[in-house]
A protein has these predicted regions:
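Flexible active-site lid/hinge loop adjacent to a nucleotide/diphosphate
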Residues: 1-60, 65-72
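Adenine nucleotide phosphate-binding catalytic loops in nucleotide-utilizing enzymes
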Residues: 16-23, 55-167
Length: 167
């Protein structure tokens, strides 16, 4: 299971009026996870959910390469997905059992608009972390990310770019 964030855009629905209430609802996903719980280390409300899972492992996702908790988790052999700066831009990198696996430059993922759409960089990182946790091979994850786009046909109404229009 994975929880990307707890933000106010979902408040006011079905009696959920505070971020703490929303975090409690979203935490159910982590409570029932068996194999791996994938959590956003950059979101304090999501990070707290790590104490509520019996999953076999936890994978932290961070866009902050020097995140102290994630660094300690990786040093202890834990799984993580981190964004790292490199000579060609930002690299999505996986860590597991002491291994360091550079995955893909963010500018090569179409939905990230050459790495500028950071929300889709984060979405791609979570997709990669989940896929890796399910045993998907790195080359298959790379191929999936290279085809992650926001065209009208793949994701209607979600950041679609139309170059053909005169405006």
């Amino acid at each position: 299971g994975a929880v990307l964030n707890v933000q106010s855009d979902h408040l006011g629905l079905k009696g959920i009026d505070t971020l703490d209430q929303l975090a409690e609802v979203k935490r159910v996903v982590i409570e029932v996870a068996k194999d791996c719980a994938v959590l956003n280390a950059d979101d304090p409300l999501t990070l707290r959910m790590s104490g509520y899972t019996d999953a076999a492992s936890i994978c932290y996702v961070t866009m902050t390469p020097q995140h102290q908790l994630v660094r300690e988790h990786v040093r202890a052999g834990g799984r993580a997905c981190a964004l790292e700066a490199g000579v060609n831009g930002q690299m999505i990198t996986l860590y597991d059992k002491g291994g360091h696996m550079p995955l893909l430059w963010t500018h090569l993922i179409p939905a990230t608009l050459e790495g500028r759409a950071t929300h889709n960089v984060q979405n791609a990182m979570f997709a990669a972390a989940l896929a890796f946790s399910l045993g998907i091979k790195l080359d298959a994850i790379r191929q999936g990310l290279r085809t992650f786009d926001t065209t009208f046909y793949q994701a209607p109404g979600r950041m679609n770019v139309f170059d053909e229009h005169p405006f």
